[in-house]
Each structure stands twice: as structure tokens, then as C-alpha cells.
Amino acid sequence: MEAYKVREAYKEWANKQSFDLFITLNTEAELTKEQMGKLMCKLFYKTECDVFGYSNREKYRNKLRIKRAVVIEGDEKRTHAHIQVKTLKGFTNEQMIELLKLEYMKLLNTKREKSFLFHATQISNRDAVSRYITKETNKQNRKLNDVIDLRSSFISKHSNKQ
């Protein structure tokens, strides 16, 4: 498939997911892509356990999860993550942002709030956000990698049903 068609397919798929928030996460230390992926897994695992409780999360693995698509950019230097997140039922976008921000700062063991580590906004233009996070599609496909980090993302199996 041609490069622009692959990128367009990613964009269309992301738009169908109806994510609410766009979050960019950085770290003070240089991390590899794998380390950043593990950090994202830990962030969402801990957040889900805080919200749903450990036993409920384990019992209802496909229901009690935060729907998200994680893209990790940067190969060796300045590795960072772009995440599209669906706000949980019963939460406002602001509450969801605050929840993830507090958990991320706790995970990094950061005492002071540093704006470059966590930046979140409500998605107002899905096309623009989807294009932005998939800008490295061609580069990753040449390396036989997926632009979306499937290990730290969570997309329900039935997310394409309307």
C-alpha cells in the first residue's frame, strides 16, 4: 500500500474511535522506545486500578479500561508519547486530565509540576490530531514497526461498530 494511503487509513481509523483528549508526555531522562512503552503501560495500569479497583479491573479486563491510542515518537533522543484518550463515563474531560496528570507525576516521582512533562487538551479537530500523531508512519513502516504502540494502547475489539 502506498505511504499516503497507509497514513490516511490510520487517520480515518483514529477519527472513528471518537477520542476526547490529546495528551503529550515527556520525561526528564532519555528513554528508549521500549522503556517509554513500559512507562505508558504502567501509567494506564495504575490509573485503571485507582479508578476501578484491582480486582474489578482484572475480572472485567475488556470493560473496565481506559480506551486509548499511544504513539511513541523519537528513536534514540527526545522520546515522547502522543496519546488520544476517551474520557471515562462519569468523568469530565478536566477530571480525566487531572487524574492522568496526577498519576503520571506520581509515576515519575516529580515533586514540582513541570509543564513540559504533561500537556493535555480537548480534541477540537480530529483530522488534525490524527494526522499529527501518525506523521511518523512511513518512517516506522520502513523499520517494520507500527506507528501505534499496540502494547500500551487499548482499543476494544468492538470499537468499529457504530
What do these predicted regions represent?
Residues 1-79, 87-162:
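Right-hand nucleic-acid polymerase module
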